[in-house]
Amino acid sequence: MKAQRSYDMRSRSASAEATRMRILEQAQALFLSRWYDEVTIATVAAHAEVSGQTVLNHFGDKEGLFAAVVDHTSGEILGRRDRAQPGDVPGAIEILVDDYEITGDASIRLLAVEHRIASVRKTMDTGRNNHRDWVERIFAAPGVTDELVVVTDVYAWKLLRRDRGLGRDETVASMRRMAEALIQTQTSAESTKRRRRR
């Protein structure tokens, strides 16, 4: 009897985890493709083929669901970006643009509403800090870090890809040229300083 109960509990636990993941995946897809205000518990429930109460049981409310999606998505973003090697500007820009191809439009939508939704503002602040840390680690150009943050920001991607209508490869090339020019400027400035000290 105990063995049967143990099996039933494991089976229920596995089923609950599968349901949670299905809800999370559907919520992620919705938050990536729609405005924050358009994503409702009812919409997520319908896409996950569960009741709204099931979504609430797993995540508490919309903010809890959004926080879980952010945790899940942040792990994916960091995993993609961690493939970049320090000093490899072309490779880093390729990885960055590939990430923006997945998350860029959603990031732009979230940036548009962060001023009025505290949980979104917190998420975007964390994203800005993570991006700056990544730029510092990958480019290792302290004299032009602020500028590198700007030319590798999601807004730069949006201006090139969405507003100017450039293709992915053209966007990569443009962002790469800007980053390399900044790094070259710093390298030249450091070289000039060394010569003056002699």
Named regions from a protein language model:
Residues 59, 64-73, 114, 123, ...:
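Alpha-helical DNA-contacting segments of helix-turn-helix folds
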Residues 29, 33, 64-92:
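Amphipathic alpha-helical linker/stalk segments
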Residues 22, 26, 30-64, 68:
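Helix-turn-helix
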Residues 145-168, 180-190:
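Amphipathic C-terminal alpha-helical segment
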Residues 64, 86-122:
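Helical hydrophobic small-molecule/effector-binding pocket
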Residues 1-18, 190-198:
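N-terminal intrinsically disordered/low-complexity leader segments
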Residues 98-103, 118-146, 170-184:
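Amphipathic alpha-helical packing segments from all-alpha helical-bundle domains
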